[in-house]
Regions:
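Small-residue-rich hydrophobic transmembrane alpha-helices
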Residues: 51-111, 148-167, 273-331, 335-337, ...
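Short runs within selected transmembrane alpha-helices of multi-pass transporters and secretion channels
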Residues: 72, 141-159, 167-175, 196-209, ...
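Transmembrane helical elements of multi-pass membrane transporters/channels
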Residues: 19-38, 140, 174, 203-207, ...
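Hydrophobic transmembrane alpha-helices of multi-pass small-molecule transporters
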Residues: 63-66, 178-182, 207-212, 283-286, ...
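N-terminal transmembrane alpha-helices
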Residues: 8-40, 44-45, 59-73, 78, ...
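Short alpha-helical transmembrane segments in multi-pass integral membrane proteins
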Residues: 1-21, 79-146, 188-243, 299-364, ...
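Helix-terminus/linker motif at the lipid-water interface of multi-pass membrane proteins
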Residues: 29, 33-52, 121-128, 184-191, ...
Length: 445
């Protein structure tokens, strides 16, 4: 690992932030492609019921993945903090404790997804024609949850060390395996949604093995001993940072699952169209998401080094970068959204339903650039309780109520339901601006 490249406390902010962010963005793009391939192949070679099953089931898998990623953010932030404070010897105990905690989380998720797979499909209000396939998809993915959790923990460790390239390699390996698996199992053996789920699990397993081999071969600035594998004080400190983020992400993703349930009530075509639109949405959110993840490490290092002015400047730099790209994404979705949805399915009705949702959602690509850069800044300061609180307020006061209200109107449409997302984000920006002013007034940042 090149120390000068992973030292964010000096040099050009843009010159350090962009090179660190790009591999994170690349990994997120491949992760989105990873999920999109399932829909693309099932949409082309499977059935409409299979497409709906993958759409609904992947929402559940996204919830698990995003929550684990945010939980692991505590590990990323604390590793970066120790590096900024020039105390890398503390990292071994942190990672050992994190392995214990994430192993326990994996066991719980495994049991829930295997035993309650059908109940999950019903709660998601999967169309009755697709309940069985959705249940199978969730169960198969649940069987491989250990690999999904392990991948996210390993990626968090590398990002905390200032290395964002290795996670890109991990997910690239998984993406290739998943594409091959989908083509063989779905297109070749006509296994529909089940084939897509098996390919997903196999790809994650290979990726984790590759990541472990890479980790053991490299020279690290710390050692991990047997006594480190316990819930120690370093681990508890990381949990204090990561737990609020995980809870906030869980409730946010639950709100999107509720949104999926609202849409499923509008019929099979709306369900499939929404699922296709969500894959495009995932791609559109990659820039702000990569900014948020990189911002946390960048800010945390500078906080550890006592350089608050540079940390705040990094936030505004991230906002500027995100806004430029967000505007481009907005125009692409508004004017070419039907072409984008048409990539995933040949069903004209499903294409139109997906485009309808994107029209309402489009503004989110712009406003999220602001919100996520601010959240990354607060995460880097360990202000994760606030990040959780503002997320809950957005979800409970704006996103869910507005989406539900739009879904029960006589003229309910996916466009109106889609607008709930940017409306909640705009409200969140206002909350965060007020909080930032409050902290400045109190001289706490």
């Amino acid at each position: 690992m090149n120390n000068s490249k992973s030292d964010f406390t000096q040099g050009s902010i843009l010159g350090k932030l962009i090179p660190f962010m790009m591999p994170i963005l690349g990994a997120l793009i491949l992760q989105a492609a990873y999920g999109a391939v399932d829909l693309l192949v099932v949409g082309r070679f499977g059935t409409t019921e299979g497409l709906s099953a993958v759409s609904t089931g992947s929402q559940v898998l996204n919830l698990v993945t995003f929550v684990v990623t945010q939980f692991a953010m505590g590990v990323t932030v604390l590793i970066a903090r120790y590096i900024g404070e020039k105390r890398p010897e503390q990292i071994g105990a942190l990672i050992g404790g994190a392995i214990v905690v994430f192993a326990m989380i994996s066991v719980v998720l495994f049991v829930v997804m295997i035993v309650l797979s059908r109940q999950i499909a019903v709660i998601m209000q999967a169309p009755k024609e697709a309940v069985g396939l959705t249940s199978v998809y969730v169960k198969i993915c649940g069987s491989g949850i250990f690999f999904i959790v392990a991948y996210n923990l390993l990626s968090a460790i590398f990002r905390g060390l200032g290395d964002s390239k290795s996670p890109l390699i991990f997910v690239a390996v998984a993406c290739v395996i998943n594409i091959v698996g989908d083509l063989v199992l779905v297109a070749g053996f006509n296994m529909n949604a089940s084939g897509a789920a098996i390919a997903t699990v196999a790809a994650q397993a290979v990726s984790v093995i590759f990541a472990l081999v890479l980790l053991f071969k490299r020279k690290l600035p710390f050692k991990i001993t047997k006594k480190d594998f316990s819930i120690n004080r370093h681990c508890r400190r990381a949990l204090k940072v990561g737990l609020p983020l995980a809870l906030q992400e869980f409730l946010t993703q639950v709100s999107f699952l509720a949104l999926c349930a609202f849409v499923n009530r509008l019929g099979l075509q709306a369900s499939s169209g929404y699922g296709v639109a969500c894959k495009i949405v995932n791609f559109a959110m990659l820039i702000p998401s990569s900014l948020m993840q990189s911002m946390a490490s960048f800010v945390s290092q500078n906080v550890g080094a006592g350089n608050e002015k540079r940390a705040k400047k990094a936030m505004f730099t991230g906002i500027g970068v995100g806004l430029v790209i967000g505007c481009i994404a907005f125009l692409l979705i508004i004017f070419k959204g039907d072409i984008l949805t048409g990539i995933f399915t040949t069903d004209a009705a499903v294409v139109q339903k997906g485009y309808d949702y994107l029209k309402g959602f489009a503004l989110e690509t712009i406003v999220t650039a602001i919100l996520f850069s601010m959240i990354g800044y607060f995460n880097g300061h360990d202000k994760t309780i606030w990040v959780m609180a503002q997320g809950l307020i957005q979800t409970l006061l704006v996103r869910l109520p507005l989406a539900y209200y739009m879904s029960i109107q006589p003229d309910a449409s996916l466009t109106k339901i889609g607008f709930a997302a940017p409306a909640a984000t705009i409200f969140g920006i206002l909350l965060n601006v007020v909080y930032l002013i409050f902290l400045k007034y109190k001289k706490r940042i």
